[in-house]
Amino acid sequence: GVQPNSFTDVTEAVQKAIEACRSQQKSVIIFPEGRYDFWPDKAVETKYYITNTSSEEEVPEKKQRVGLYFKKLNNITLEGNNAHFVFHGKMITWVIDSCENIRIQNVSVNYERPGMSEMTIKEITPGSVIAAVHPDSKFAIINNRLEWYGEKWVARNFHAVLVRPSEDILLYSSWTPFLNSKAEVIAPLTVKFTGDFSAFKAQPGDVLTIRDRYRDYVGAFHNRSKNISLSNVNMNSMHGLGIVP
């Protein structure tokens, strides 16, 4: 069985529960409230070409690991009871393919290490930037350069957006001046970048978000299915694109 708050990989056991519904006319999969961890190691591997994601040139191998895989299934309700599903590495949270009457309710979704990295600008001059890195954004300083990394992945192709909470706006930005600068940790989760920031438009309090521009994964995928219902489902983080119907 699957126990909440065990911090062990529940992926295989949950998939067996989903498959057990195949022989039933109507099923309810019930999760007691708590945390459930999903890892890609034993997850179902799929191959989908999904619109508005990475091209064949950017990511030639279209293979995705899936946390919850519904394939040719009908009349299933997943009752989360406010459970918290935490995904690791790069995974699609769920795929619903060639199904009918599937309902997912009362569950929140997050990643142990979100694919988006964040840091808040504290000080900025034409020659330097001091930023506070979000605790969930894992990084290392290697050869005076900041490297963003996650669970079995490293960011290499950067897309940056600046969030200005004071005005509630988003602005296109660039990681290039940081990529070309010298980085050093000056306090816990605080990094000083020294370089040419004369063209970097930001102000203290802005949050710079950085992700890989290649969308090799999506948050969730619904394919050739009908009567799919999501109720009280909170997606706190997703790799790549969002929920693709």
Spans of model-derived segments:
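Acidic Gly/Asp/Thr-rich repetitive segments characteristic of extracellular carbohydrate-active
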Residues: 1-29
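Extracellular beta-strand-rich solenoid/capping regions of secreted or surface-exposed proteins
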Residues: 15-24, 37-77, 86-105, 113-128, ...
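All-beta strand scaffolds that present successive hydrophobic residues in beta-strands
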Residues: 31, 77-80, 101-107, 202-209, ...
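Extended Gly/Ser/Thr-rich low-complexity repeat segments
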Residues: 108-110, 137-176, 197-219, 225
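Acidic, Ser/Thr-rich low-complexity intrinsically disordered segments
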Residues: 124-138
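Residue-level recognition of beta-strand termini and adjacent short loop/turns
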Residues: 125, 164-179, 183-195
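Charge-rich, low-hydrophobicity low-complexity segments
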Residues: 195-199, 236, 241
